[in-house]
Design a protein with these regions (language model features):
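Active-site loop/oxyanion-hole signature of alpha/beta-hydrolase fold enzymes
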Residues: 9-10, 20-21, 62, 68-110, ...
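Catalytic histidine neighborhood in serine/cysteine hydrolases
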Residues: 244-258
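Flexible "cap/lid" loop of the alpha/beta hydrolase fold
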Residues: 120-125, 129-161
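Conserved HGGG/HGGXW glycine-rich cap/lid loop of the alpha/beta-hydrolase fold
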Residues: 24-80
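Conserved alpha/beta-hydrolase catalytic His-Asp/Glu region
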Residues: 144-146, 161-217
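Catalytic histidine-centered segment of alpha/beta-hydrolase-like enzymes
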Residues: 256-269
């Protein structure tokens, strides 16, 4: 679970709803002082939310980019159905296309972890809205065996327990890491996340096929693979190989693990804006 440094957005960002042809999505919309030189659409990972990108928003706007971080359907402040079918990857990818359409300008697409696999699916449906694609800590196929087991344990618990009961069980087994975030914010996010969404997307993470060759064939589209120097969800050598197969730029953020966006935000933002500036 990503732990943002705060749930309070910086002054450059406004919390609002993005209205699309597929419904309303809660977003943090950060804008630079002048005319943006580009717009970025940010997709969070499994159990995450738009707040996972909070520490990147100010550096992005300072570099001249508008950034729109979104809660996907069933994530935190975006409502979603109670049926697992509503969270099929094709549905979530279609949501991304609708979000890009509503933003109204071509976007640099970035997905973290699960968000990267949804971003990939969106590009494979229709690459036309996207200027570039960044996959952050998001691998070529299913997650590692250890993570598959963790996802199964969580999904089994969600079938028989309430979200509050699961939260308390997780905290008992895995106390929160030291963080400036008030644990109440993390709990509030968890309780507002759809259990159906977690079960459906968790399953996707455990069975996702390797679609790297399909993605590599999408040209011209600059691609960027970003990760920390350690990752137990998709091992770093696997991400290295994926980047090579994609012909993508590769960035390893020193001192970061599965969430460079929260572990080392300044270094991560610098690598991203350099890529978007044209340093492909």
């Amino acid at each position: 679970m990503s732990r943002p440094p705060t749930f309070t957005p910086p002054s450059c960002a406004r919390a609002r709803f993005l209205s699309t042809r597929r419904g309303r999505f809660a977003v943090l919309d950060a804008r630079p002082a002048g005319e943006p030189q580009g717009t970025v659409l940010l997709l969070p990972g499994f159990t995450g939310s738009k707040e996972d990108f909070i520490a990147l928003l100010e550096p992005f706007t300072e570099a001249g980019y508008r950034a729109v971080a979104v809660d996907g359907r069933g994530q935190f402040e975006t409502e979603g159905p109670d049926t697992q079918e509503a969270y099929a990857q094709s549905e979530l990818a279609s949501d991304v296309l609708a979000q890009a359409e509503a933003i109204g300008t071509p976007v640099h697409l970035l997905g973290h972890s699960l968000g990267g696999q949804i971003a990939r699916a969106a590009v494979l449906l229709d690459r036309s809205p996207f200027v570039s694609l960044t996959l952050m800590s998001s691998g070529p196929a299913q997650v590692s065996p250890v993570q598959r087991e963790r996802v199964k344990l969580l999904s089994d618990a969600l079938v028989t327990m309430t979200m509050e009961q699961v939260w308390q069980a997780m905290r008992a087994m895995d106390p929160p890491e030291e963080t400036p975030v008030d644990g109440a914010d993390l709990q509030r996010r968890w309780l507002r996340t759809s259990a159906a969404q977690l079960i459906a997307t968790g399953r996707q993470l455990t069975v996702e096929p390797d679609r790297v060759a399909e993605l590599a064939a999408v040209q011209p589209l600059p691609k960027h693979v970003v990760s920390g120097e350690q990752d137990d969800t998709w091992p770093v050598p696997l991400l290295d190989a994926m980047a090579e197969r994609l012909g993508a730029r590769r960035t390893v953020v020193g001192g970061a693990q599965h969430s460079p966006n929260t572990d080392r935000p300044q270094e991560t933002a610098t690598a991203l804006t350099d890529f978007w500036d044209g340093g492909h």
